[in-house]
Amino acid sequence: AAIQAGRAGAKTLLVERGAQLGGTTTTGGVSFPGLFDAWGKQVIAGIGWELVKESVELDGGTLPNFARVPQRHWQNQVLTNQFLYALLAEEKCTKAGVEIAYYEFPQAVTKTESGWTVNCVGFGTRRRVNCKQIIDCTGGAEVVGMVGFSRLREEERQPGSYLYRLGDGHEPGRTRLNRLYVHGADSTNSR
């Protein structure tokens, strides 16, 4: 969202709680995004796909053949190098004129006549941002909750994924990705 806003000419600030962009694909270590296809053709494109495609190309990888419909949908997930993905995301933000505030998060959001005031905090820093629009990509709809809107929680939630390797040392990146899904794991948090 930040890259598109920047490309469209909007003055954009991306407030990132962590050390890198990319969320679950990078910091979360689930570096096999999907799904970009259905019924034997690619159906999803855009900036997310641009990042995935370029990270695979830079890493010397290959993309799945979306014309082939696999027995299991996960067989068309794209194995990416999460480190390249994070670097590409930052590079694209920079080229689009997006300012990035790492290690910061919104503490309070207030409605104003002209939009919103967002108070952000981080290690040794505070900032007050006046803006016309807010896009909440926190994963838990934290900003949505701060402004007083209700958030939904389904009875059955998507389980978390746990990635590990036994034996040789871990070599991150697309070529050594081993994954295990724990179906039915409780993905609730402390809220």
Please give the residue ranges for each predicted region.
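Flavin (FAD/FMN)-binding glycine-rich loop and adjacent Rossmann-like elements that form
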Residues: 24, 86, 103, 122-133, ...
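Conserved beta-strand-loop-beta-strand element in the redox core of flavoprotein oxidoreductases
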Residues: 110-128
